[in-house]
Amino acid sequence: MVQLSTYLPSPPSTNMSCTFSSVMSVCFMTMSATVLPICGKAVTSHLRSNSCLTRVSSFLNTSRPQLATFPDSRASSSTSSSMHVPLPTLTILTPSLHQAKLLRLIILFVEAVLGKAKMIKSAFFQVFGSSRSEWYLAL
């Protein structure tokens, strides 16, 4: 019988101030926030230039063998070989709140303009007929 605990990844290093669980909880819970509190620092829209995000990235890269070490079932009990599975790189793409509001405002404006243009065009066609020259003269 195989124990599940032998296949679970080992816990991350405790000497880092940013732990893997806190980083992942921040990534999943605050994707739409303007300020992301990672390791006690404020991460605004300049996520790539933040030193704490660099520390998180370096932490994930340095602890990769610890997080991805699994016992090799084909190896004999005398040798302690393990295989290393590469983990994906952590990438956070979060638009700022102002960018999201601006994009929504642009979408609403375009929808309103297109809707009004269709209504105005249909009203002109009903009043002045469907001839293009009559429609331009009415403008």
Swiss-Prot record:
Membrane topology: Single-pass membrane protein
Localization terms from the record: Membrane
Keyword Transmembrane: yes
Main location: membrane
Domain of life: Eukaryota
A GO CC annotation given for this chain: membrane
Keywords: Membrane, Transmembrane, Transmembrane helix
Note, other: Almost completely overlaps YPL113C.
Protein name: Putative uncharacterized protein YPL114W
Lineage: Eukaryota, Fungi, Dikarya, Ascomycota, Saccharomycotina
